[in-house]
Amino acid sequence: MRGGLWQLGQSITRRLANGGDKKAVARRCFATESELKKTVLYDFHVAHGGKMVPFAGWSMPIQYKDSIMDSTLNCRQNGSLFDVSHMCGLSLKGKDVVSFLEKLVIADVAALAHGTGTLTVFTNEKGGAIDDSVITKVTDDHLYLVVNAGCRDKDLAHIEEHMKAFKAKGGDVSWHIHDERSLLALQGPLAAPVLQHLTKEDLSKLYFGEFRVLDINGSQCFLTRTGYTGEDGFEISVPSEHGVELAKALLEKSEGKIRLTGLGARDSLRLEAGLCLYGNDLEQHITPIEAGLTWAIGKRRRAEGGFLGADVILKQLADGPSIRRVGFISSGPPPRSHSEIQDEGGNNIGEVTSGGFSPCLKKNIAIGYVKSGLHKAGTKVKIIIRGKQNEGVVTKMPFVPTKYYKPS
């Protein structure tokens, strides 16, 4: 969402705190309450003080009783439980499923071991990003994906269009959209010890990016050790009829240390981790190379291509892109999406795509794009906010060190 969820959260919180009508706020934020979809945890959120706002066609909690800053810090120190059921999980199956998906994404899907996954990007014919997605190889003929809520319709239409053409040529592939499941994200240092209380599976042997189908709290779940915060954690796909029960069990086992957390803190956490938000930092005119996601292009894919827009992307890989995604630390007010970036001579060199105040660093941080050659850490820039220049410096990302659970 343009401008960042943290900023949206602050704006909506102020409106509600000042006596703003919830329906009026909903209308201003793109949809009426009656038009919004609700996850199975909607009543659970409301009962726990969730401030519900429109997001990607859903009514979602932007925050709870804690401030966005306090929620961010608690995730880093203890843990957070997020309802991310608005995102779309789907399974692709068939003996030709790997070759099919490799036409649409940049990952080396064939090289993935069973039960492992990776971040990838769906690209268009011009090499731009249709969406980013976490893809997991369950088996050679079963892939599991999660795509962004705001991109669901276009992603599914894109996949379906290419699937029809692929099947018309004799390819064996089918799909199932997991609308019968809910998705919870458990993040933070207490995520693993708390979840361990609810499963017999030894989670110490499940590493970052790995996937299992297992029993959690009496329900068959899809468990991926991943997340969107930079912390260790899990995404749990649970049958929707057991979603509330699982959320309650996780909170109970944490003895109050893991807290329900909304989209506002989730955005500040991902910003501190230097991760892209589709619609801000990644869009249809931005390539994976420009976005700093070169690492996501498998070695074999760099040699063979074969995905949409490969000619553009591989040329950028060889020659270098004209713009690059970078991080910034700045003075003055927090940078906003679309804030102009200038060099020290006052020349336009780029634009901020995400920005805000870092609760952990107690500094303003931002992500944006600048001209190649001006992307190196330590480069001094000016960020224009409300017509005034503010000092900034290009900074390596992540801003806050990540704590992914990997083999030692």
From Swiss-Prot:
Belongs to the GcvT family. Keywords: Aminotransferase, Mitochondrion, Transferase, Transit peptide. It comes from the Eukaryota. The keyword Transferase applies. GO terms for biological process: glycine decarboxylation via glycine cleavage system. Its main location: mitochondrion. GO terms for molecular function: aminomethyltransferase activity; transaminase activity. Its EC number is 2.1.2.10. Substrate binds at residues 235, 266, 404. This is Aminomethyltransferase, mitochondrial. It is an enzyme of class 2 (transferase). Residues 1-30 form a transit peptide. GO terms for cellular component: glycine cleavage complex; mitochondrial matrix. The glycine cleavage system is composed of four proteins: P, T, L and H. The glycine cleavage system catalyzes the degradation of glycine. The keyword Transferase applies. It catalyses: N(6)-[(R)-S(8)-aminomethyldihydrolipoyl]-L-lysyl-[protein] + (6S)-5,6,7,8-tetrahydrofolate = N(6)-[(R)-dihydrolipoyl]-L-lysyl-[protein] + (6R)-5,10-methylene-5,6,7,8-tetrahydrofolate + NH4(+). It is found in: Mitochondrion.
